[in-house]
Amino acid sequence: MNLWQQNYDPAGNIWLSSLIASLPILFFFFALIKLKLKGYVAASWTVVIALAVALLFYKMPVDHALASVVYGFFYGLWPIAWIIIAAVFVYKISVKTGQFDIIRSSILSITPDQRLQMLIVGFCFGAFLEGAAGFGAPVAITAALLVGLGFNPLYAAGLCLIVNTAPVAFGAMGIPILVAGQVTDLDSFEIGQMVGRQLPFLTIIVLFWIMAIMDGWRGVKETWPAVMVAGGSFAIAQYLSSNFIGPELPDIISSLVSLVCLTLFLKRWQPVRIFRFGDMGASQVDQTLARTRYTTGQIVRAWSPFLFLTATVTLWSIPPFKALFAPGGALYDWVINVPVPYLDKLVARMPPVVHEATAYAAVYKFDWFSATGTAILFAALLSIVWLKMKPSAAIQTFGSTLKELALPIYSIGMVLAFAFISNYSGLSSTLALALAHTGSAFTFFSPFLGWLGVFLTGSDTSSNALFASLQATAAQQIGVSDVLMVAANTTGGVTGKMISPQSIAIACAAVGLVGKESDLFRFTVKHSLIFTCMVGVITTLQAYVLTWMIP
């Protein structure tokens, strides 16, 4: 079968080509913001439009185009949707066994203030999960926990998506940074150092931003000491670990340091006014706490599903475990690799997106045991045994989880179908090249390339795999540091996570907002654009003024 070469400028004018390439994305924005379509409807129509652009404008062969859509849809089911199914199952086990009431009480005993609960659960615990697992699990788990604590589901999902900005670049044991190094031949350690000199600024800003969203300027004034402790300790640990240890552990170290510092601080300090959403006043919370006291053993038992989850996900993420399932590993036979018919190595990526013409691999990996979702399922099984849940109740709970998540799973599949047709047709690369044509202003627009990549794929890792090489090439053309531009792709990417259709679908699934994706998208989109502009300003200053910050 002939190799089909991607053409990134079919119109003969990069700006006109990029305008046509952007049609599916513009429709998706319009469908969610103005038409207020349900997520699965918007995603389905977006795939249809992307297919039309790929076939009619890019002249992609029909079999390649359809194969990329099917490949993307199944990738959405496994491993992405599998993570969400397992994560929601763990949460439901906690609720069904009555343990979540104790979890709620234990958090309330640290602080009844929901602004500070957001810092503890959404930020610290979420960052830890991002460092260990990534790929949607942190938002799903923390948003569900916050709903259980009395948060409005839309706010819980939206705030968790926004606060997840801080740890994404170093997520899943630093995979985004490591991939950026692999595709650019740059030192991953240096890229990690550079990201560690950009993200700490954004981390503290994001936490103050969250307080303002929740409770306005009054909230910022009342919580700033706690924000400085949580954000400051995280930012310092993030800088030190990324610059002196490596890109694998900044999230794990920073989140634990921040959690310990914040918890100890809240033993001594509480805001003057206790903030809660809705009508539940501080006095009612205090009365609830006064009536219910749990032993340390009861609290540890209640938290056991999430302790098991943390342990299994961390075990699954460490290099020796991963090496077992890598090519040449002892358990590599457990991984089922299926080359995608009519697509695998039948599409060629072309310069300047890559250094030389490269056949685009398309191999569907069914890693039934080594997938993160399976690690979370093991945590669920351990929880069932430890909490003495009846097998019939566990099976019923798993069944209800699948039933509730049926539409979100379809949405996630269609979102990934759109991402894959965009990548294999060259549509996403056309948009990237248009941004790279902005000349010396590219330092400002560079993070938008990472933002675009994460919007399309839902992953900072995938964004770097797509665009890091292009960032390095553009940097050399305009005479700025390639390490800085590749780092900007990573840092800019974190700001796109909160509006990625994949992330939106996952968050809605976790908090029971199926069909309300348009509401959540409208909640996060302005914050995403503002943060990306901030990263653009930081990157430009580092490129032309603060050059001493570049390793």
Swiss-Prot record:
Membrane topology type: Multi-pass membrane protein
Catalysed reactions, semicolon-separated: (S)-lactate(in) + H(+)(in) = (S)-lactate(out) + H(+)(out); (R)-lactate(in) + H(+)(in) = (R)-lactate(out) + H(+)(out); glycolate(in) + H(+)(in) = glycolate(out) + H(+)(out)
Record's keyword terms, sorted: Cell inner membrane, Cell membrane, Membrane, Symport, Transmembrane, Transmembrane helix, Transport
Keyword set includes Cell membrane: yes
Function, in words: Uptake of L-lactate across the membrane. Can also transport D-lactate and glycolate. Seems to be driven by a proton motive force.
GO cellular component: plasma membrane
Taxonomic classification: Bacteria, Pseudomonadati, Pseudomonadota, Gammaproteobacteria, Enterobacterales
TM segment ranges: 13-33, 37-57, 69-89, 131-151, 159-179, 194-214, 245-265, 306-326, 366-386, 405-425, 438-458, 530-550
Claim: Cell inner membrane is one of the keywords in the record: yes
Stored NCBIfam families: lctP, PRK10420.1
Name of the protein described by the UniProt record: L-lactate permease
GO terms for MF: lactate transmembrane transporter activity; solute:proton symporter activity
Species in which this protein is naturally found: Salmonella typhi
InterPro entries: Lactate_perm
